[in-house]
Amino acid sequence: MKSLVRVAVTGAAGQIGYSLLFRIAAGEMFGKDRPVILQMLELPDEKAQAALKGVMMELEDCAFPLLAGMVGTDNPDIAFKDADVALLVGSRPRGPGMERKDLLMENAKIFTAQGAALNKVARRDVKVLVVGNPANTNAYIAMKSAPDLNPKHFTAMLRLDHNRALSQLSTKLSKPVANIEKLIVWGNHSPTMYPDYRFATADGTPIIEAINDQAWNANSFIPTVSKRGAAIIEVRGLSSAASAANAAIDHMRDWLLGSNGKWITMGVPSDGSYGIPEGMIFGFPVTTTNGEYSIVKDLPIDTFSKTYIDKTLAELEEERASIAHLLR
């Protein structure tokens, strides 16, 4: 058995948390030879804590061989103590009549506090994935609130968008998703994201040879991927939970265990590549090895792509400006 890993999960009793925890405990995130301790954070109110207790009872009842221990708490200092990995799932959802800027402000308070708690008690090499929306800006806030931790280890989840785009291409081409490589989702985890298959291949053949159809790209593919979350809410009555949890597992597994040379999409702090301001958390194509990621460099950006990348960048710059005063 490998050494155990301490995993902090916020919003642990929520829909995504419930879909996520059992799969982590079963070994799907870190491998079938890595014991885990789950350190679960929920809101301090009675209902949330009772729900968390119920989740912990169910985890006990699964008798997972890899589950070496559990902590359930409303205290971030306890949940993040010595954490190797932190999955920041919980965030304030957008309520009726709430403006986007109000949502940003409410979440800025949460992620400032969580970043500070990570800075105080987590392992110095902790790897952080922000799932709670607006994920890119929440990750930026947490990163800026944890000055003693490695900023490169604060990431946002764009893997759900990546997986959604993979699925759409798979359907269009009648090819298995496993045979499609070099897909990218640029930018913000929001409807402005830009799924880009210009470099993608299916069975080693460039996809643009099979789908040389800019009208389908602009009018069907991009809108379907970018509005998929809203489409699921419309029919399910609830937001994506199982698919989001699955994407979180994919993101962390590939980051920690390696992508084997394959491109994946991660929201990571920019190093200035592709003209994206340094430090901004932005969706890039990356490869991963030995627990570290590298941005895929020097891909040509055509006029069509630049329009979309500029739009998602502008949105992120606006979000960052709206919360800048909270980070001074």
Curated annotation (Swiss-Prot):
GO terms for molecular function: L-malate dehydrogenase (NAD+) activity. The active site is at 189 (proton acceptor). It catalyses: (S)-malate + NAD(+) = oxaloacetate + NADH + H(+). Its EC number is 1.1.1.37. One of its GO terms (biological process) is malate metabolic process. NAD(+) binds at residues 11-17, 107, 114, 131-133. InterPro entries: L-lactate/malate_DH, Lactate/malate_DH_C, Lactate/malate_DH_N, Lactate_DH/Glyco_Ohase_4_C, Malate_DH_type2, NAD(P)-bd_dom_sf. This is Malate dehydrogenase. Pfam families: Ldh_1_C (PF02866), Ldh_1_N (PF00056). It is an enzyme of class 1 (oxidoreductase). Gene3D superfamilies: Lactate dehydrogenase/glycoside hydrolase, family 4, C-terminal, NAD(P)-binding Rossmann-like Domain. Belongs to the LDH/MDH superfamily. MDH type 2 family. Substrate binds at residues 94, 100, 133, 164. It comes from Xylella fastidiosa (strain 9a5c). Catalyzes the reversible oxidation of malate to oxaloacetate. Keywords: NAD, Oxidoreductase, Tricarboxylic acid cycle.
